[in-house]
């Protein structure tokens, strides 16, 4: 199964979970899936007092597929202000919901806050694939999810990645900048 097929199946299942037409998210994408891959190489940190975690963040993409190291922990998720280690599952693909899916689902699906903690003794690798609509595509909460009782939480935005990379380094969570006021 290729990445596009896996991605499309997952967002179709997610639409069904919300009692939406199966292709609701696919249509919001405008028929184009953008996939950006990155190879992460974390060097060991020999001195425990020098170990630095990556800053906590959510991914800008709608969904991230992550192949993580087969032997070493490092990925942690935040829930209720507590950090939980992702288990090492060789050959497993972790799936994270990102900010763009939170926007399109009008906040029903939450983007996963996470960080990486390097190992003090061994190098670690991971390969994330960030999947979402093409950058030029405007996205917003799906109309079927907006009602009088549940108004839009997020504005429609074009090129969310640009917003993400403008605010992420400042410590401001980028998705908060596109919330309705």
Please describe what each predicted stretch is.
Residues 1-181:
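C-terminal flanking tails of non-heme Fe-dependent oxygenases
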């Amino acid at each position: 199964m290729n990445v596009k097929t896996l991605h499309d199946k997952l967002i179709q299942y997610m639409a069904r979970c919300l009692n939406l037409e199966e292709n609701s998210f696919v249509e919001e994408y405008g028929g184009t899936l953008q996939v950006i891959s990155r190879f992460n190489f974390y060097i060991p940190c020999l001195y425990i007092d020098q170990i630095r975690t990556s800053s906590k963040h959510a991914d800008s993409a709608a969904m991230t597929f992550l192949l993580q190291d087969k032997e070493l922990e490092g990925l942690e998720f935040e829930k209720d202000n507590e950090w939980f280690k992702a288990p090492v599952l060789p050959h497993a693909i972790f799936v994270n919901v990102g900010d763009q899916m939170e926007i399109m689902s009008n906040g029903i699906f939450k983007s996963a806050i996470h960080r990486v903690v390097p190992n003090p003794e061994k190098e670690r690798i991971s390969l994330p694939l960030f999947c979402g609509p093409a950058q030029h595509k405007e996205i917003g909460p799906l109309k079927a999810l907006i009602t009088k009782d549940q108004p839009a939480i997020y504005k429609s935005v074009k090129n969310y990645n640009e917003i993400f990379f403008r605010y992420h380094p400042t410590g401001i969570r980028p998705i908060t900048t596109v919330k309705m006021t």
